[in-house]
């Protein structure tokens, strides 16, 4: 009997985890439908020298030394150190959303993220362990700063309250970002084309710092999203109380928190709030137009901080970068490039292809890219950006019920689609909801490539995906018509009892 790849991988992982957890044979039939075994209420243990470690930042012990507004602010500054590490937002936790999708191509010359790309990873995969560890460093240390800030708040001076408000806002936003990244990677999408998966296993959430060797369990996906929304609303509230943010986009701002909340609501299929917060983010960031020429577009990726469309980016530059572990290296020396499929999706006059530059040694059959949005190892990650807000608003309004919603959807989509100079009117985007939605899905691929969102788009749309491209320059995939909405990465085995 012929066995499909999807059936085989389902069987292999089910059998593997049954042995790993020593489950009874009569339970096997209940988990064959999942790509990876996810156990609701799985017991996990925090390790003393692992992801629940605290950190001394500028000499301040975050367990005992957060005794004033300045120390809380400094502790939050320390959160960005964990957050921007290449183990997390600086590379692995971001790029894992693009590498295993139809947008990426691996030429086979190096062994970086190759198991992720080829779907041969196990629960012992180091990338998955690093993402988990550093995500929880952000979450746990954020909890410490939040708890300390809340205790100090009522007895603080008005000036110190403003300092605490900004610190608390950033801590809540960082924690929300980390939770969303982890639940996207280790949990099911909360909604898949209208179907609710809120009751599926999510991640470990706790409002309190988790002690070393404390036994904890997973919340549901729905509970995880509820906590993410609460954190982001708290962040926005504290930015409002402060009357301002730091005004530097290497720190979370009010606009960035609103933009992230718009993304969360999009995943939840809460169309009204997704559109509302996307527009609020654009308004607060004072963005009303985006680049439409090759020169304008290339300039945004020439150095850190010059991208006027970004709401939040990492403090990666000539002095602070990850060198060989950077995204620039991943998308060049480490063999990854835009897939032949993606390249064919761009029009001849699309300004976004102005950054598609190839190495002198590149050939059609063995492409060697020169970074794209990461042309050097010193180029930063732009994590929350204005074009995504226009696309969120377009998709949300497309699910509206009125002619005005449809018009607003096309107008928002047109802002981004005009990166292709040949597109000048909404009529070119489609005249029916289905046509416009199909265009929007492709536009998200074109616009958000290298921003780490493709995997979650394919899953939430319930696309029959093609993955593991090969045979460049032809459009070929090892696995086709794959129900990727059921794909969930395993929690690292080191974290499971």
Residue locations for each model-derived region?
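Conserved, well-structured interaction surfaces
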Residues: 112-186, 219, 237-240, 244, ...
């Amino acid at each position: 009997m012929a066995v499909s790849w999807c059936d085989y991988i389902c069987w292999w992982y089910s059998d593997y985890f049954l042995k790993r957890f020593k489950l009874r044979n009569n339970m096997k039939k209940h988990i064959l439908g999942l790509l990876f075994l996810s156990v609701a209420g799985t017991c996990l243990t925090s390790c003393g020298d692992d992801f629940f470690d605290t950190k001394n930042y500028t000499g301040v012990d975050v367990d005992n030394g957060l005794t004033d507004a300045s120390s809380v602010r400094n502790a939050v500054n320390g959160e960005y150190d964990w957050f921007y590490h290449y183990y997390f937002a600086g590379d692995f936790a971001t790029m894992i959303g693009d590498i295993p999708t139809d947008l990426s191509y691996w030429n086979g010359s190096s062994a970086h993220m190759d198991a992720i790309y080829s779907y041969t990873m196990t629960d012992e995969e180091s990338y998955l362990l690093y993402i988990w560890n550093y995500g929880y460093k952000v979450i746990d240390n954020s909890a410490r700063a939040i708890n300390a800030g809340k205790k100090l708040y009522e007895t603080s001076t008005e000036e110190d309250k403003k300092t605490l408000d900004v610190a608390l806002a950033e801590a809540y936003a960082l924690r929300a970002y980390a939770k969303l990244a982890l639940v996207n990677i280790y949990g099911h999408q909360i909604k898949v084309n209208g179907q609710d998966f809120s009751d599926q296993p999510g991640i470990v959430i706790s409002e309190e710092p988790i002690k070393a060797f404390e036994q904890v369990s997973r919340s549901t996906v729905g509970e995880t999203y509820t906590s993410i929304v609460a954190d982001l609303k708290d962040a926005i509230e504290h930015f409002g109380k402060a009357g301002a943010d730091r005004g530097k986009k290497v720190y979370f701002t009010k606009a960035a928190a609103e933009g992230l909340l718009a993304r969360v609501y999009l995943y939840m299929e809460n169309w009204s709030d997704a559109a509302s917060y996307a527009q609020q983010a654009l308004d607060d960031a004072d963005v009303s137009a985006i680049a439409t020429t090759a020169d304008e577009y290339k300039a945004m990726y020439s150095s850190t901080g010059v991208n006027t469309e970004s709401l939040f980016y990492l403090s990666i530059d000539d002095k602070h970068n990850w060198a060989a572990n950077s995204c620039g290296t991943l998308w060049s020396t480490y063999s990854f490039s835009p897939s032949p499929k993606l390249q064919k999706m761009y029009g001849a006059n699309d300004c976004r292809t102005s950054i598609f530059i190839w190495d002198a040694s590149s050939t059609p059959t063995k492409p060697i890219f020169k970074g794209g949005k990461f042309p050097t190892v010193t180029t930063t990650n732009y994590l929350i950006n204005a074009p995504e807000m226009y696309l969120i608003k377009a998709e949300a309004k497309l699910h509206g019920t009125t002619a005005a919603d449809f018009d607003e959807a096309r107008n928002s989509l047109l802002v981004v689609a005009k990166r292709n100079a040949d597109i000048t009117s909404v009529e070119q985007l489609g005249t029916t909801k289905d046509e416009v939605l199909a265009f929007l899905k492709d536009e998200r691929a074109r616009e958000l490539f290298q921003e780490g969102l493709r995997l979650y788009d394919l899953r939430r749309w319930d696309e029959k995906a093609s993955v593991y491209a090969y045979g460049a320059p032809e459009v070929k995939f090892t696995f086709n018509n794959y129900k990727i909405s059921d794909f969930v990465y395993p929690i690292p085995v080191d974290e499971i009892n």
